[in-house]
């Protein structure tokens, strides 16, 4: 039997319709959204009676989820939006001609790659809606994007250098995101 699934996104009370999630503690949201099913069991969220698994299962790059939320919650035009999106790695993928012939074994790598292709697609959609200069995606590439989730030693040896390199390469583009102080978000149910 396949369990019923329902996509759910925790939301702050930045819109008057969002009445419940803001009560959930930040650690619980983080735990729910990082419950990678091959590493951790789902997170049982008692108030809702739901069990959450990693958001990356359906939105490995949530840039479009956020963009749709902003456009639906506020009276705002796309030209007022700038997006900074930081990824966790997107290794290069090439489908070998033999794999294209089919079969479960041949397509195993393609299935894994499909998760990364959706990441590229989400970024491309956001750039299409906003304009290419309004959405900056910083993503580790090559070998830096292929660290297994439980490989702490490799992450410790690779990620600091990778972050320094990506920061240096994107420094000028990043500066605009920190040039002025953002206004506080709207709060409809919680205290300011």
Annotate the PLM regions.
Residues 1-192:
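Conserved catalytic cores and adjacent C-terminal regulatory segments
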């Amino acid at each position: 039997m396949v369990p019923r699934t329902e996509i759910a996104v925790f939301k702050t009370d930045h819109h008057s319709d969002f009445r419940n999630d803001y009560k959930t503690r930040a650690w619980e949201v983080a735990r729910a959204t990082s419950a990678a099913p091959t590493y951790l069991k789902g997170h049982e969220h008692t108030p809702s009676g739901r069990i959450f698994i990693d958001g990356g299962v359906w939105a490995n790059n949530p840039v479009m989820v956020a963009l749709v939320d902003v456009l639906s919650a506020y009276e705002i035009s796309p030209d007022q939006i700038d997006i900074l999106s930081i990824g966790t790695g997107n290794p290069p993928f090439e489908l070998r001609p033999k794999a294209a012939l089919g079969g479960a074994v041949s397509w195993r790598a393609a299935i894994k790659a499909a998760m990364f292709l959706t990441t590229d697609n989400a970024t491309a959609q956001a750039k299409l809606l906003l304009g290419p200069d309004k959405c900056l995606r910083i993503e580790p590439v090559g070998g830096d994007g292929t660290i297994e989730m439980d490989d702490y030693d490799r992450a410790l040896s690779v990620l600091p250098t990778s972050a320094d390199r990506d920061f240096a390469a994107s420094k000028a583009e990043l500066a605009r995101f920190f040039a002025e102080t953002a206004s506080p978000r709207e709060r409809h149910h919680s205290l300011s």
